Amino acid sequence: MNSKVFVVLLLLALSTCVLSEKYCPTPRNTSCKKMNIRNNCCRDSDCTSNAFCCAEPCGNFCHKASDKPGGRRVDPNASCKTGYVYW
């Protein structure tokens, strides 16, 4: 009986961890003119209020976490500078 209770509690704990995963929201814009690309952040630590630094077509921007996957967090190891990006 104890092993059944343990398994149920373990599954409950694991599902809570999986459901609490946070993501970058889906970007609003799907395209961007090159002259409008700017990075407001290069890593999560550049953002305030526990926001994520998310990659979007017009650059990197801080966003509140979303429960649904759809966006992409910026790779903190990638070469990045804040400000306008000139190609």
Swiss-Prot record:
Residues 1-20 form the signal peptide. GO terms for molecular function: toxin activity. GO terms for biological process: defense response to bacterium. The lineage of its organism: Eukaryota, Metazoa, Ecdysozoa, Arthropoda, Chelicerata. It is found in: Secreted. Residues 21-66 form the WAP domain. The keyword Hydrolase does not apply. One of its GO terms (cellular component) is extracellular region. This is U14-lycotoxin-Ls1b. It comes from Lycosa singoriensis. Expressed by the venom gland. Keywords: Antibiotic, Antimicrobial, Disulfide bond, Secreted, Signal, Toxin. Disulfide bonds join 24-54, 32-58, 41-53, 42-80, 47-62. Has antibacterial activity. The keyword Ribosomal protein does not apply. Contains 5 disulfide bonds. Belongs to the venom protein 11 family. 01 (wap-1) subfamily. Its main location: secreted.
